[in-house]
Amino acid sequence: MKNEGKLDIIRPFGPAIGSTNIPKTLIDKINNFIDEVIKDKNKSKKFDWGKYLAGQVTQEIRLPNEIIDGELLNFLRESTKAFVEGLTDKKVTKFQLISCWVVRQFQNEYNPIHWHNGHI
């Protein structure tokens, strides 16, 4: 994939937005996990994260540590670091991912305007 891992910072209407390409290996890993979850009622229930999220969608699936740890966590860490250091004079010395999930959204479902906890 072209420019994989490169972060661009854009400001199309005010606040800065980080734009990057997620490596295909990560997309495949996440998609394979989601495919596995949606085929299994017990896993669908176990990883259902919808009750904690703002969206009015069919499925919001929490990613477990075995999916996050390693390449995905490193990608998110490096992208966040590039974003923060690209906008400020601050050096990122610590990164903690609180939670990570996939929104599986279908026609006529919506995700309302909302805020996320945490600090960048």
Region spans (language model):
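Non-heme Fe(II)/2-oxoglutarate
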Residues: M1-D89, Y110
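A generic structural micro-feature
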Residues: P12, V92-K94, H114-H119
